Amino acid sequence: MKRGKSKYLLLSSGNMVINIDYEEALHFHRKHNADVTLIYQKVPADCPEKGYTLTLSDKDRVLELHKPATLSDGDNKFLGCILIDCEIFQDSIEKSYAEGYHHFIGDVLATSLKRLRVFGYQFKGYARRVTSVESYFQVNMDLLDPRTWRELLNPNPQHRIYTKINDEAPAKYMEEAKASNCLIANGCIIEGTVENSIFFRRVKVGRNAVVKNSIIMQYTEIGDDARLDHVICDKNTVIQQEAALSGTDEQPLCIGKKAVL
């Protein structure tokens, strides 16, 4: 960092599912002559997450940064994304290390709100943190909403998410297959009934099998007459004929890689 020529540094949480244009946040940062800009979102009424919240002035200045036991409807939830001037970040890290501090948010930023010009930039799109099996399951289920899917996987080249390409034949639906509200990847063969589920490539669903509210990863085979509901199957799993597996929204049943059940 000392040898770099960049004026600004972007720190972003690795467990946040979000598609954000940081150019707009950078414009906000410059417009307010900020030392630090924290990106936040208004908490929706059904948000089960925990984390830091921001108390803001009417001019978007951060007055307080704290971590309540639970988040409430309308709280300003910090998304773990920070724009900061490089020199200020470097000075803050060196100072906190010398004083024995280890947490940049709680130990450094939260105690520097009067010394630094810290502002909050509101993000109004989809943003969810994956911190548990439950939240992983819920974020995947959110993709079944076309509005969420289009926002996260935006076809606009400036916002597009690039992934590894793996060409396969199109999914094949047999005569008795029934599919509703699913994301089904190439290479899948569907002979049974699938609802509200996500299927990775080359999944096979047998005759009269029923899969609901589940995440089925690649190369999984689901036998004839099997029943799955609220299940997460890792790749290369084999679910035998007439097997019945189920979980709940809060506790989806997880099947390990290469398991045979």
Where are these regions (language model features)?
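Unchanged
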Residues: M1-M141, I255
